[in-house]
């Protein structure tokens, strides 16, 4: 999934900028970004909810609230693995639905920054050889400045 594909889902670049920042906060804690995959998608009654998915893959993510340390949001993304990405269809077409437990998580246009974070990581971030994390860059600058003698 390209960043352009992600922009078409988020409708705004703000959520994508936030996605990299949320990702950086989460890997800072234990060095990994954890996403759960539902193994029993055949047990889901998706058609009763108006969802037509050929080969469903349900993903769940967890993101800590930036504003309240005791609040964790759950993100659910439904992907149709049967969608073949080619010249006519891109990665966006394989995303059948998404939801987040945050106050803005059930948007009808675009998605919240939490959903954008998981989509960014799954579709783009994890395929990069290196992800520039703003905080690491700032930490290195502070270390370099701290090592210099003051006059």
What does each model-identified segment do?
Residues 1-151:
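Long, low-complexity, compositionally biased intrinsically disordered regions
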């Amino acid at each position: 999934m390209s960043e352009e594909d992600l922009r078409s889902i988020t409708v705004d670049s703000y959520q994508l900028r936030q996605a990299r920042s949320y990702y950086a906060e989460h890997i800072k804690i234990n060095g990994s970004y954890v996403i759960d995959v539902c193994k029993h998608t055949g047990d889901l009654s998706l058609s009763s909810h108006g969802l037509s998915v050929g080969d469903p893959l349900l993903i769940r993510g967890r993101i800590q609230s930036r504003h309240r340390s005791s609040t964790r949001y759950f993100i659910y993304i439904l992907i149709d693995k049967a969608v073949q990405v080619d010249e006519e269809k891109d990665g966006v077409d394989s995303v059948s639905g998404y939801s987040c437990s945050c106050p803005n998580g059930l948007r009808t246009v675009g998605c919240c920054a939490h959903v954008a974070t998981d989509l960014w990581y799954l579709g783009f971030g994890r395929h990069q050889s290196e992800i520039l994390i703003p905080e690491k860059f700032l930490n290195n600058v502070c270390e370099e400045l701290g090592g210099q003698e003051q006059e």
